[in-house]
Amino acid sequence: MMNMIEWTKHVLESDDTKLIYWLTLLMVCMIVDTILGIVIARINPKEKFSSFKMKTGILIKVSEMIIALLAVPFALPFPAGLPLLYTVYTALCVSEMYSIFGHLRVVDDKSNFLSIIEGFFKQTYRKDKGDK
C-alpha cells in the first residue's frame, strides 16, 4: 500500500504528469459517457437508437479530445497557460460527468448543474439543522 502512495506522489510531482492525468480522466469520462449512451439507447424501449446521434456524439468527443491535445503546445509557453489548461480540462470533465448523470437520470436537460449542487447543500443543511 505504501508503494502505491509513493508512486502517486511521484506521478503528481511534475506538471507534465498532471496534464496527462487530466487528459486520462477526460478520456475515461468520455468513454463511460459513450458506452452508457449506447447501452441505454439499446435497452430502453422508450429511447429510439439513432446511429446518426451516436456518430455525432462520437465525432464531438473526438474533436474535443483533439482540441484538448492541441491546446497543450500552444498554452504552455505562456505564464497563464497551465492554469488555463487545468480550467479547460476541468470544465470538459464536469461537462462529461453532467452528461453521464443525464444518462443515469440523475439530472435532466432542463436543470443546470449549479441548481443541483445548491439543492444538495440545502438538503444537507436542513438535515443538520434538524439533528440539533
Swiss-Prot record:
Intervals, Cytoplasmic compartment: 1-61, 108-132
State which ranges are Periplasmic (membrane side).
Answer: 81-85
What are its GO cellular component terms?
host cell plasma membrane; membrane
Assigned keywords, A-Z: Cytolysis, Host cell inner membrane, Host cell lysis by virus, Host cell membrane, Host membrane, Late protein, Membrane, Transmembrane, Transmembrane helix, Viral release from host cell
InterPro entries according to UniProt = Phage_holin_4_1
Q: From the Swiss-Prot or TrEMBL record, state where the protein is found.
A: Host cell inner membrane
Q: What Gene Ontology biological process does one annotation of this record name?
A: killing of cells of another organism
Q: Transmembrane residues, as ranges?
A: 62-80, 86-107
Give the membrane topology. Answer: Multi-pass membrane protein
Which Pfam family is an annotated match for this chain, by its short name?
Phage_holin_4_1
Origin superkingdom: Viruses
- Protein family membership: Belongs to the bacteriophage holin family. phi29likevirus holin subfamily.
NCBIfam families the record matches = holin_tox_secr
Domain writeup: Isoform Holin has 3 transmembrane regions whereas isoform Antiholin lacks the first transmembrane region.
Put simply, this protein is called: Antiholin
